[in-house]
Each structure stands twice: as structure tokens, then as C-alpha cells.
Curated annotation (Swiss-Prot):
Localization terms from the record: Virion; Host nucleus; Host mitochondrion
Residue span of motif Nuclear localization signal: 400-403
Main location: virion
GO CC, any one term: host cell mitochondrion
Organism annotation: Influenza A virus (strain A/Chicken/Hong Kong/FY150/2001 H5N1 genotype D)
Protein name: Polymerase basic protein 2
Amino acid sequence: SVKKEEEVLTGNLQTLKIRVHEGYEEFTMVGRRATAILRKATRRLIQLIVSGRDEQSIAEAIIVAMVFSQEDCMIKAVRGDLNFVNRANQRLNPMHQLLRHFQKDAKVLFQNWGIEPIDNVMGMIGILPDMTPSTEMSLRGVRVSKMGVDEYSSTERVVVSIDRFLRVRDQRGNVLLSPEEVSETQGTEKLTITYSSSMMWEINGPESVLVNTYQWIIRNWETVKIQWSQDPTMLYNKMEFEPFQSLVPKAARGQYSGFVRTLFQQMRDVLGTFDTVQIIKLLPFAAAPPEQSRMQFSSLTVNVRGSGMRILVRGNSPVFNYNKATKRLTVLGKDAGALTEDPDEGTAGVESAVLRGFLILGKEDKRYGPALSINELSNLAKGEKANVLIGQGDVVLVMKRKRDSS
């Protein structure tokens, strides 16, 4: 597509220089929880058909498409100044500025977009500015499909990948579209938009970073737990905790980290003080370079939804809420997964059953290698010894019995 620079004025009368993509184009947008087909002309959204798992995912896809369309009513919907920066403190380019702005709050964007009456089409419904479904009216040009979007795309599909700089490339690596003209030296890493890569968690803003970080910990809890007790430094340095740091107020990062690491060390030292939920909750804070200080905290602040919200060191909060009855974690009201082990019950019952057939010889003995999880014990041969991590974070040395006790 032909690109030319245009100066546009936001609703706050700030001048933005954007590169306008001219001519008709069709895109297939694929996120992890929503897909969409966008047809657009120069600075105009012609049609957006979106399908997604829930209201939030659909809203996120609509915001991306509206920004991508470069329509004037989107630019005029900006309230306040755009001054988002990346981690190196450089201003983001205008298209990213707009994206971040509306990902934080899209109310004005949706209100100003305009609505239109819709025809009744099988499998399609309308969506109103407050993101509720409707069969009579819809945001201009926008429709929600209940069945997915594949059948609405035209036949010739170009397979493209979108990297974390919002550059669109074809299979040969040619840049088809980008927010800035790209010199090829900028690297050609290829990240499609599934958010399994932690580098991409940020694209959907702070809430996505928060939820994705905790989901990652829960999904990998078995290995995280072992690293937590055996090799915490390696765990703290994992890149999955990188995006989270941008949510923690700069001045507090080092203090929080020092505080949490000390707390964790006490848990490791004092038998029986291992608390799964608390470890999961505080772990991302331990990733920053720690400052040694005597500071104690009862709550830690994260910047989401445009303001600081608190995570309580002990107990639940709207940001991080663990439900003992359902064993599920919700982060900012979104489900972040289930804990397979029960953190509070002291998993003694399960473990004594699992450890039947093993003799507990005493405390951990480093000569027998790193601690195994309960699940890995089944691989031991009779008479073989191993360290094993039992529920409350204690590591003990066991030996598989030579003969099965009946």
C-alpha cells in the first residue's frame, strides 16, 4: 500500500504525524482469544467482523481495528496528552501512542464512533458502544460473528506475521505495513499475535501483563516450586517476569524486591511456613534488582487501570483474589486458573499416600541431586535414593523400598 505522512490533530489539539496507508486493504487479525476481519480504505474502516471468547477480548480486537483504521473520529476521541514511553523511556510512535491510550480507556472512542441500524444476518449480531450485543443497532461498520470469521474473508489469503513493533510482514519477510518506515537492521524477529510469548503481553496493556504473568506461574507451578526452593536466583531472572516490572512504581521496585526475597528466604528457613498462594502472589515482585533495606510492607502497589492498585501481602484484594473453596485465582476479576494442589490444607494426606512405598531417611542430602516433585518419584528404581519436595516447601531424602509393603 502507498504510505504518506499526514499531520492530524487529536481531541486535545496535540499534533500527531502519522503515516497513512492509502487504498483498500483487507486484514485478518488473529489474537489468542479473538479473531477479526478488517476491511479498510484510506483512513476509513469499511467493515470489521469480529469473533471472540468474551466481551473483553472482543473489545480489545475492536480497539486495535479502530486505531489501525486511522479514522479521524478515532484521533478526535483522544482526551488528554499522549506521552507513553517504552522501558528505555523513549516515546512510542504515534500509532502505538493511540493504541496504548485507547487500551487504557476506550469509552470516548466507542461513544464517538457512531452507530447504525443493522440487517438481520444469520450468525451475526451488532455490538453497542457499551459493548453489549444488539440485534437492531451496532457500532458503525462493526459486527460480531458467533461462528468465527473464516468464511467471511475473501479467497486469496496472504499469510502475514505481526511482530512486536506492529510491523506486518509477508512470508518472505517483506514489510507490508508498519507504524514507522523500517530499516531492515531493526531485526526480523517473527512473533505472531499469540500471547504465549511474554514479550507480547504488553501489547494489550497493563491488565493483560498482570493476568498473563500469574497464569504463567500457575501453569508452570510444579517447576516454579522446585526452582523457588532450590535455585531462586535463576527463577527471579526469568524473562517472563520482565513485563511485570513496568507495572511496579519505579521508586518501589528495589524495595519491594528486597522485602519479598527476604520473606521468601524466611519461608525456606523455617519449616512449615511455605504458603503457595503467597509465593505465587509475590513472586513477580522479586524479579527486580533488590535493595537491602529494613522496610516492611503490608501491601504492594501496581499501576493498572490508570492508577495504583494494591496487592495485599497477606489476604485477598480486587487485584489478586484466591478462592479457597473453588481453588481458583482471579486477577482483576479475570480467571487466572486453578491451583492443582491445595495450598492451605497442608497436602499431608495426598503425600503420605504418594510416599507409601518410600522410606523417609531425613533431611535433604545434596549428593542426591536437585529435589524431584512427587510426580517424578515414580521413576525411581527400588533401593534408589532421591531428594523430594513435599507440599510445605520442605525437601526430604527418601529411598524407594526394596520390597513393596502390602
